A protein has these predicted regions:
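N-terminal, post-signal peptide beta-strand-biased segments of exported outer-membrane/organellar beta-barrel
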Residues: 21-90
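Short loop/turn motifs that connect adjacent beta-strands in outer-membrane beta-barrel proteins
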Residues: 24-26, 40-48, 93-102, 116, ...
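Hydrophobic, lipid-facing positions within transmembrane beta-strands of outer-membrane proteins
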Residues: 49-51, 55, 82-88, 126-133, ...
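Membrane-embedded beta-strand positions of outer-membrane beta-barrel proteins
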Residues: 51-55, 103-107, 132, 146-150, ...
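Transmembrane beta-barrel outer-membrane domains
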Residues: 77-83, 121-127, 168-174, 206-212, ...
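Outer-membrane pore/translocation modules
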Residues: 102, 108-209, 272, 287
C-alpha cells in the first residue's frame, strides 16, 4: 500500500458544521461536518508527519415544520457554505496495548450564509479540533481493524453576536469520542465510523446544545491507482437541548428542533499520485426530518428547521516527513 493511500484511509479528518450562519445554537448546529469521515478507515499509515488539505461546499435549503411556522411557507430559503481546512497527522510509531498511536490537529476556515427571509452571512475561523489520541488495532491477517479516539473542539474560533453564535466559532467546548471499524483487504475499504458530539454550556447564553450522533459509511475498491465506491452518512440529535436558569433565550428551547435525523447517499472517486493522494466525494441528503414535541405541546406549533442539500468535498493528503528519509538540502543552499 502506498503511503498516500494509507494516509487517505487512516486520517480521521473532521471538519466543521455549515450551520453557523443561523446565529443560534441548538438544533442542527453540529461542530463536525456530516460525512467528514467518509473515505477514512481504522488503519494507520507508516510513521511520519502528514498534512491534508480539504475544501468543500454545501448547497442546501431549509426544510421541516418551521417552513410554515417560521418562514411563511418559503421552501427556497437557501443555506450555503464554503470551507477550507488544513490539518496535520502525527504517527510517531508508538504502540500501546497492541494498538498503533496517532494524533491530529485540524484548523478550518469557513464562510456561510442563509437566504431570505433570514439574510445573514458570516466568515471566520472555526474552533480548532485537537485529537490528542487515536489507537488502532489490526486484527491479525483478517483484514479487520478497529480504531478509537477522542476529539476536542476548543472555543478559539471567531465569536460574534449577542449570544456568541453569530460567526464560525462557538463559546463552548465539544468532546467527540469516535469508533471506526474497517475491513481492509484486497483493495477494499469497508468502513463504518461512529462519533458523537457532547457540548458544554455556552458561556454567554447559558444554552446547552443536545448530543449529536454521526455515522459515516464507506464501501470503496482500489483498482490500480483509482479508488471508487458508494458512500453514505447519517447524523441526528439524540438528546434534548437545555436552557436552564440564567439562559438568555426568552423562548427557551421551543424555537429549536429537539430531534432531527438526516440521511445522505453518494459516491467517492480517488487517485493515488504516489507522493500525494486526491479524493473527491459528493453526497445528496435524501431524507431530513426535525421535530420539537415540547413546542407543539406548549404552543400548538412546531418551529423546527434543518438544512437538506448537497455536499461536494475534495481532499489532498501527503507525507511531509518520514523518520527513514534523510534530510533534503535546501534549494537555496550554497
Amino acid at each position: 500500500m502506498k503511503t498516500s493511500r494509507a494516509l487517505l484511509a487512516a486520517a480521521g479528518v473532521i471538519a466543521v458544521s455549515s450551520s453557523s450562519a443561523f446565529a443560534i445554537e441548538g438544533g442542527e448546529n453540529a461542530q463536525s461536518k456530516a460525512g467528514i469521515l467518509i473515505g477514512a478507515s481504522a488503519g494507520v499509515p507508516p510513521p511520519g508527519i502528514y498534512m491534508f488539505d480539504e475544501v468543500f461546499t454545501v448547497q442546501s435549503n431549509l426544510t421541516g415544520p418551521g417552513v410554515n411556522t417560521k418562514l411563511g411557507g418559503n421552501t427556497k430559503t437557501g443555506v450555503e457554505s464554503a470551507v477550507d481546512i488544513q490539518g496535520f497527522l502525527f504517527v510517531p510509531g508508538w504502540t500501546f496495548l497492541g494498538a498503533t498511536y496517532d494524533a491530529l490537529i485540524v484548523q478550518p476556515f469557513s464562510t456561510a450564509s442563509v437566504g431570505s427571509p433570514s439574510n445573514v452571512q458570516d466568515a471566520g475561523m472555526h474552533d480548532t479540533l485537537l485529537i490528542p489520541v487515536e489507537l488502532s488495532w489490526k486484527l491479525g491477517d483478517s483484514g479487520l481493524a478497529v480504531k478509537t479516539g477522542l476529539g476536542i473542539y476548543t472555543p478559539d474560533g471567531t465569536v460574534t453576536g449577542l449570544y456568541g453564535t453569530g460567526n464560525e466559532g462557538s463559546p463552548y467546548w465539544t468532546f467527540q469520542p469516535e469508533l471506526v471499524v474497517s475491513y481492509l483487504k484486497d483493495g477494499w475499504n469497508l468502513s463504518a465510523a461512529i462519533y458523537e458530539e457532547f457540548h458544554t454550556r455556552n458561556t454567554i447564553s447559558q444554552y446547552t446544545t443536545g448530543d449529536i450522533l454521526h455515522a459515516d459509511f464507506t464501501a470503496t475498491k482500489q483498482i490500480g491507482k483509482w479508488t471508487v465506491g458508494p458512500v453514505a452518512y447519517y447524523y441526528g440529535q439524540v438528546s434534548n437541548d437545555s436552557c436552564s436558569v440564567g439562559c438568555l433565550y426568552g423562548t427557551g428551547t421551543l424555537m429549536n428542533p429537539q430531534r432531527f435525523n438526516i440521511w445522505a447517499v453518494g459516491g467517492l472517486v480517488g487517485y493515488d499520485f504516489g507522493p500525494a493522494n486526491l479524493s473527491v466525494w459528493a453526497t445528496q441528503e435524501v431524507s431530513a426530518k426535525a421535530s420539537n414535541p415540547a413546542a407543539v405541546a406548549a404552543t400548538g406549533s412546531d418551529f423546527s428547521l434543518v438544512a437538506q442539500g448537497t455536499t461536494v468535498l475534495a481532499s489532498l493528503s501527503y507525507r511531509l516527513w518520514a523518520p527513514e528519509q534523510a534530510a533534503q538540502p535546501s534549494m537555496y543552499h550554497k
